[in-house]
Each structure stands twice: as structure tokens, then as C-alpha cells.
Amino acid sequence: DKESCKPNATILCYPVIDMFEYRHDGSRQNLIGERALHSDKELMSLYKHVTPNTPPTFIWHTSSDQAVPVENSLMYADALSKVQVSYEMHIYPIGSHGLGLADSIPHVAQWKDSLEKWIKLNDLI
């Protein structure tokens, strides 16, 4: 028997999606190097590879993230929408990059409850 390795869903928290204008320099350096070719940047810019087979996606980000611009999440959601892949996105007004569970910012911490509801809505558990 063969098992599919395609994920049933993706959960993206302040994701790095773009290797061009809205890149996170540290991620780009670690993934493709300082002197990456244009083709490498294209390959690692995930919004350019969304297809109707992309799994449903839950995204959250903060608009004040100074490390990874919120445009990364917006670009990915736009790409999902264009091929009619189901997604839910939450953009919170405050919060730095790397908040984890965000317990120190109650308004942002609600992402966990939203995720749980999304998982149930999509019959993932």
C-alpha cells in the first residue's frame, strides 16, 4: 500500500512566502544563499506555486511584524483565492514576529481558538 505524503491542511503562522520584495533576509540567506539566482527565488516564493491541489490553509500574522512583512500572508491568501483553495486568515493589528502562542497578547492569543474551530470545520480531527 502506498500512502499519500500530501498534507491534509497547512497551518501558517507569520510565514515567509516571498523571496523578492517582501522577503525575510535571514530566511532567504538560509534557504537559497546570498547570491541566489532569480530561478531559485522563484522556486522558493511559495505563492507562485499554489494550485487547485494545494491543501486548505489556516494563516495568521500581525500587521506590525517587523521581521516578516504581513504582505507574505496576504500574497499567499490571494494566490489561494485565485485557484479557489479554501483558507482562513487572521491579521492582528499588534504583535511582533515569533509570538508563539501569543499568551501575553490576549487579542492575538485567540488565534488558537480560531484554529481549533477551523480544524473541526474542515473535519481534520
PLM regions: where:
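C-terminal catalytic histidine-bearing segment of alpha/beta-hydrolase fold enzymes
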Residues: 70-125
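Alpha/beta-hydrolase-fold catalytic nucleophile elbow
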Residues: 10-14, 60, 92-93
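Primarily recognizes the serine-hydrolase "nucleophile elbow" in alpha/beta-hydrolase
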Residues: 1-26, 41-42, 118
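Acidic catalytic loop of the alpha/beta-hydrolase fold
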Residues: 19, 64-68
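Loop/turn elements at helix/coil->beta-strand transitions in domains of secreted/extracellular proteins
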Residues: 6-9, 54-56, 83-88
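Short beta-strand/loop motif that positions the catalytic acidic residue
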Residues: 53, 58-61, 65
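Active-site nucleophile elbow and catalytic-triad environment of alpha/beta-hydrolase enzymes
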Residues: 34-49, 54-55
